[in-house]
Amino acid sequence: MNSSNNNDSSSSNSNMNNSLSPTLVTHSDASMGSGRASPDNSHMGRGIWNPSYVNQGSQRSPQQQHQNHHQQQQQQQQQQQQNSQFCFVNPWNEEKVTNSQQNLVYPPQYDDLNSNESLDAYRRRKSSLVVPPARAPAPNPFQYDSYPAYTSSNTSLAGNSSGQYPSGYQQQQQQVYQQGAIHPSQFGSRFVPSLYDRQDFQRRQSLAATNYSSNFSSLNSNTNQGTNSIPVMSPYRRLSAYPPSTSPPLQPPFKQLRRDEVQGQKLSIPQMQLCNSKNDLQPVLNATPKFRRASLNSKTISPLVSVTKSLITTYSLCSPEFTYQTSKNPKRVLTKPSEGKCNNGFDNINSDYILYVNDVLGVEQNRKYLVLDILGQGTFGQVVKCQNLLTKEILAVKVVKSRTEYLTQSITEAKILELLNQKIDPTNKHHFLRMYDSFVHKNHLCLVFELLSNNLYELLKQNKFHGLSIQLIRTFTTQILDSLCVLKESKLIHCDLKPENILLCAPDKPELKIIDFGSSCEEARTVYTYIQSRFYRAPEIILGIPYSTSIDMWSLGCIVAELFLGIPIFPGASEYNQLTRIIDTLGYPPSWMIDMGKNSGKFMKKLAPEESSSSTQKHRMKTIEEFCREYNIVEKPSKQYFKWRKLPDIIRNYRYPKSIQNSQELIDQEMQNRECLIHFLGGVLNLNPLERWTPQQAMLHPFITKQEFTGEWFPPGSSLPGPSEKHDDAKGQQSEYGSANDSSNNAGHNYVYNPSSATGGADSVDIGAISKRKENTSGDISNNFAVTHSVQEGPTSAFNKLHIVEE
């Protein structure tokens, strides 16, 4: 700037200082010797002791003083805008700028502007006047922990004298002083333009902030004593928010950047293309940069980690008052649906108690079971994983529905488990579930059990529904048979034996336990007729015949076959489809069962004499068309999961494990084990419940005892009932059963004690052998025979006249 501008600036500063004096005097009337001059001192030569001025100031009211002070400030601002001139200095220590186009990109119409023109011509500029340097990637964040202090020797303005300034600000002041672009007396002016705003250094530093150098000495202190501690500012706008990243000796090629900007760059506008298929897509893979903002080599914290894994720490840094406790988390609901509809809002529409995580059960009866998670949900209610807050033990709690029918059934289960745990199996050796406690919570019966692992169905699912090894099947079958032996001796029926109700004690041990005695009953009190899950339902239940503990043996046979095959052997979609699958695989049940069954007429059709293929075949299964037409339902044909229909063929032709496919010796051993398994399944899957093996008999089979299987095996001391002169009805039923085995429709069926049929042969049952073994039968009705204790309504002569003597 020229000297005239300097004089104007100095005069404006003096006027500003003089204009502040009246306010200072009026605010401090007692300090009359303050040495400040009135606005008239420069013209009248009077000091502050002018009586007219003192009297005039003392007579003014505070409101008038405030208005005058406001008017004076407006005049000062207008005078400053008129007197201040714009001065730009190259911040990168380039040669002295004489023409604005040498370092600024201005339109042609401003070429003739000289340095004395007003700044008003430049207010319309929207583009940045300075091209900022590139930011350094992956900086060291500890570099900005502290800045070199920049303090002034003058403390006339206390509010601005204690701040710290970065070295970039000092660097610019040093360059401006060395170039002589501004007179030293103007360094104290607050309107000298600067690249730096003090607010820029109070903002949060970026992860890629620039590198400030502190290799420059501070400015001389012999500047204007009034405002030398205020940072140099631009009157209207900051030129750039980014200070230079290098020191003057290492000048970056900014000339090339400005030259490119003058020449202009072509903008790449993205174009939209129609894509009809994925082949039209042409993705561009950008190369990964060598250095990233948040890398393993940098000391910065990844923003992604700070807002995810370390979110609590981030909140704590932002607000010291922030606290977090997991106990205050909203409780996660475990029951679906979770809307309260019954029981004062505690139950949903299905009468299930609405459970939440961290709920405490049993408080009303001095129990404390903390709910952790849900284990399962069924028709009876829910099973949740809980912790006993008194003993710190992890348990399973069964929360029964609040309906009366489910409550009655659960009370029966609790009584049976109490009988098993305390009297029948107090030593916990026979693989029964242990019940520890029972209580009522919000009108719901809660049973506390030991916590077990996965069930057998989940085990098959983990094995991708491939069959297990015969050795593991033998281990599981032995434990289940041990439990069934205890139940038969106690005259108890489980009534719902299936893979879902057989649980592993631990995921790494082949130890089992039987659960869910909610459907259990005593042999003498068989009240319900619709029991068992469909896949494992015995034929006598489907036909409507009185049942006994033999139905559990049928379920065991279905479970063993499923463990070997990986899928259920009889996956019926309905009762009609279930009975169809059983007959296709094992043959027709004996005629006395069909005649005696209450539901036989629903699935069977009695043959006319001319339609019967033999004198003993009196019934046949209804076709799908006949069954659907009669009951007005839609029944789909059975889906075949196996290539073969008969049980022996299914077992023999099941795929070999990969571990033995290359060894003929291992294959021969596998086939021998399969023949033993076929014979075992033939005994427990006998359609006749009177001839079906008991648990005690099955425990002696070579498949369980690992004895050598020669192809023939009979339970020790067992005998089959045969024709008897005393019991004509029994004779007719047995002869009818034996002759039915001769029909070609039952060829290949594995009948109970015939070894040839167990190997898949078509020979009929040897009636002579059966007649010889009948001599060992006793004439008295055995009280141990289960069916005699479960007789319901209807004819029972066949059950009362047949008997088996058990050891």
Curated annotation (Swiss-Prot):
Protein name: Dual specificity protein kinase YAK1
Lineage per the UniProt record: Eukaryota, Fungi, Dikarya, Ascomycota, Saccharomycotina
Biased composition (Low complexity): 1-19, 55-84, 161-180, 214-224
Binding residue positions for ATP: 375-383, 398
Span list, region Disordered: 1-84, 124-180, 214-254, 714-758
Family: Belongs to the protein kinase superfamily. CMGC Ser/Thr protein kinase family. MNB/DYRK subfamily.
Active site: 496
Function summary: Negative regulator of the cell cycle acting downstream of the cAMP-dependent protein kinase. Part of a glucose-sensing system involved in growth control in response to glucose availability. Phosphorylates POP2.
